[in-house]
Amino acid sequence: MTVFEGRFTDAGGLRIAVVVARFNDLVTGKLLSGCLDCLSRHGIDVAETSSQLDLAWVPGSFEIPLLAKRLASSGRYDVVITLGAVIRGDTPHFDVVVAEVSKGVAAVARESGVPVIFGVLTTDTLQQALERAGIKSNLGWNYGLQALEMGSLMRSVPA
């Protein structure tokens, strides 16, 4: 029996794209900081001159799948990380955005064969989002770790 597992220490040579939503940037900026900290501590060059990492900003979470698809389909990246925050309001808008971004990100991964990490927080309140983006823990770190694991795993599984 063959067992395939991704490794966090095997980041050398991985090319990563990060797509971040500007809307709710108080939250998404913190997620990005946590994500970049994780990637850096695991050997990914996160400097502005990096050839391993590219960063793309989109207006909001709804736009994430479109750019994630462009990046994943480019053949330049081993993994795409998506970061966003959708916070429930008083209208059904939350439900529409959450449904579309989650389906869209999943479709990009399936269609491109490139792992796309779903790092879009969906919370009822701003407080809940902030707790997940740094007050209690920073899920951005987890999304970075997931990217490293999936990038390594995909390299180990024969096509």
Curated annotation (Swiss-Prot):
<feature type="binding site">
    <location>
        <position position="23"/>
    </location>
    <ligand>
        <name>5-amino-6-(D-ribitylamino)uracil</name>
    </ligand>
</feature>
<dbReference type="GO" id="GO:0009231">
    <property type="term" value="P:riboflavin biosynthetic process"/>
</dbReference>
<dbReference type="InterPro" id="IPR002180">
    <property type="entry name" value="LS/RS"/>
</dbReference>
<dbReference type="InterPro" id="IPR036467">
    <property type="entry name" value="LS/RS_sf"/>
</dbReference>
<feature type="binding site">
    <location>
        <position position="132"/>
    </location>
    <ligand>
        <name>(2S)-2-hydroxy-3-oxobutyl phosphate</name>
    </ligand>
</feature>
<feature type="binding site">
    <location>
        <begin position="90"/>
        <end position="91"/>
    </location>
    <ligand>
        <name>(2S)-2-hydroxy-3-oxobutyl phosphate</name>
    </ligand>
</feature>
<dbReference type="Pfam" id="PF00885">
    <property type="entry name" value="DMRL_synthase"/>
</dbReference>
<feature type="binding site">
    <location>
        <begin position="61"/>
        <end position="63"/>
    </location>
    <ligand>
        <name>5-amino-6-(D-ribitylamino)uracil</name>
    </ligand>
</feature>
<comment type="pathway">
    <text>Cofactor biosynthesis; riboflavin biosynthesis; riboflavin from 2-hydroxy-3-oxobutyl phosphate and 5-amino-6-(D-ribitylamino)uracil: step 1/2.</text>
</comment>
<keyword id="KW-0686">Riboflavin biosynthesis</keyword>
<comment type="function">
    <text>Catalyzes the formation of 6,7-dimethyl-8-ribityllumazine by condensation of 5-amino-6-(D-ribitylamino)uracil with 3,4-dihydroxy-2-butanone 4-phosphate. This is the penultimate step in the biosynthesis of riboflavin.</text>
</comment>
<dbReference type="GO" id="GO:0000906">
    <property type="term" value="F:6,7-dimethyl-8-ribityllumazine synthase activity"/>
</dbReference>
<comment type="similarity">
    <text>Belongs to the DMRL synthase family.</text>
</comment>
<dbReference type="GO" id="GO:0005829">
    <property type="term" value="C:cytosol"/>
</dbReference>
<keyword id="KW-0808">Transferase</keyword>
<feature type="binding site">
    <location>
        <begin position="85"/>
        <end position="87"/>
    </location>
    <ligand>
        <name>5-amino-6-(D-ribitylamino)uracil</name>
    </ligand>
</feature>
<dbReference type="GO" id="GO:0009349">
    <property type="term" value="C:riboflavin synthase complex"/>
</dbReference>
<protein>
    <recommendedName>
        <fullName>6,7-dimethyl-8-ribityllumazine synthase</fullName>
        <ecNumber>2.5.1.78</ecNumber>
    </recommendedName>
</protein>
<feature type="active site" description="Proton donor">
    <location>
        <position position="93"/>
    </location>
</feature>
<dbReference type="InterPro" id="IPR034964">
    <property type="entry name" value="LS"/>
</dbReference>
<feature type="binding site">
    <location>
        <position position="118"/>
    </location>
    <ligand>
        <name>5-amino-6-(D-ribitylamino)uracil</name>
    </ligand>
</feature>
